[in-house]
């Protein structure tokens, strides 16, 4: 918890203080009073009866003693339960394929009043210009959009080709920006553990802010060393005992439930009354279809309550107060005097049924957000421009030669998990010894014109056709999987023609595609339109076989070398446990 930095985010003038205190004392008229409401007590459990009094952006008072306080406007909550606005502790907005403006429109009416985002997806493509655009969006947003400064661009030096660098000098230029809360996930955990000076320089430079971690499956002395370097949290835990050990060693635990990585069921049993201040909720990557049909942080709270019997005050605590404290955002996370009036009114607290949302003391109207979306997006000056330098490809670019009797490495996918296994498969004149093996390739899309890196993929469920995308963590080269070289080439050429995007090919034809004109990562369409297009893509993909629930998001992580065990980057097959490149043929 970084109380030392709270002053950076809690902007309130002396005049605002005087006005707030006057309303708190009962000597002045409030702006809003929320009547007929019960407030969920996140500290003591139970509920607090009485109105909530708001002046400007802040809560002036709470409780029955304010029943007769005059106000410019009164809101009848109709017996609703009030809770603090929800906070996502770690996400990449770009992975929703929405702009920050569209993301706000889609999630703010669901109670998501604050996000802590790492824009390293667009920074890997466009460098500092991408970070600057996110900062502009954050400055004009109603939603509290805070930024962690991207620390690993690319994710691992020397393992992939990305579009831009983000130097320490450039990072430092953003450190004191009012929307910056710290240093984003330090993914090169072997480098930190081994004391690489370039990484320690980054940690030292952001030491007084929050230092985000990334260490899937790490334990023993290595975990101790990583934490000793100053890393404060991790969102990559996927096993119960792994999460427990990190909590024991002083790390804060971000429990992630995204579109590809589903760790809530594994980690929810850890949450209790005692450790909940050290537990937070995050999505990391969640697509617009899931947001529209299931929700965002509201969906995670619902599952904690309904499926894991987490007490109400604890479930809402880890969705708000715990995260606010961790990032030094002490003006957020509680419904109490002096706190920012980010309030979610729930008609049913157990089902997380959102009735109304207020942020910074103002009621949110979903229709107004939608009506203003285009104008607000234009005001942010999005960084348009084609970032795909790759020329069209042909089937011969994906030709691989196999020798009968030889054994070859296969990236073995685990549905709805980011980690993969490494297995081997024997080739014969009739093909591989398991029929789930298909082809995967990664094509550098920026400047070096590297030949496609090709490999084998198992367990994905692709029985026919091909899928291609320019969303491919973290360097966002073109990734394609397929059963035939011809269909792989067709899918790749479609996303090149679109200037970036997603594509499904089957029966030798493009069945569905989605252009992503901003950095090959984001659409400028509305959230509703984007959700419908995602629905069409998923429907087309399902015709190709029993794929993961979110095939494109899962596919996007097959090239991320900092998550074990076997991945494919633009430079070849990478062993994520040894942190070294390996060969397609098994020769050991």
Curated annotation (Swiss-Prot):
For the keyword rRNA processing, the answer is: no
| The enzyme's E.C. designation | 3.5.4.2
- Reply yes or no: does the keyword Hydrolase apply: yes
Supply the source organism for this entry: Shigella flexneri serotype 5b (strain 8401)
Q: What class of enzyme is it?
A: hydrolase
Identify the coding gene: ade
What is the similarity comment for this entry? Belongs to the metallo-dependent hydrolases superfamily. Adenine deaminase family.
- Kindly provide the name given to this protein in its UniProt entry: Adenine deaminase
Instruction: Spell out the reaction equation it catalyses.
Output: adenine + H2O + H(+) = hypoxanthine + NH4(+)
Top-level taxonomy: Bacteria, Pseudomonadati, Pseudomonadota, Gammaproteobacteria, Enterobacterales
Q: How does it assemble?
A: Homodimer.
One matching Pfam family is: Adenine_deam_C
- Essential cofactor(s): Mn(2+)
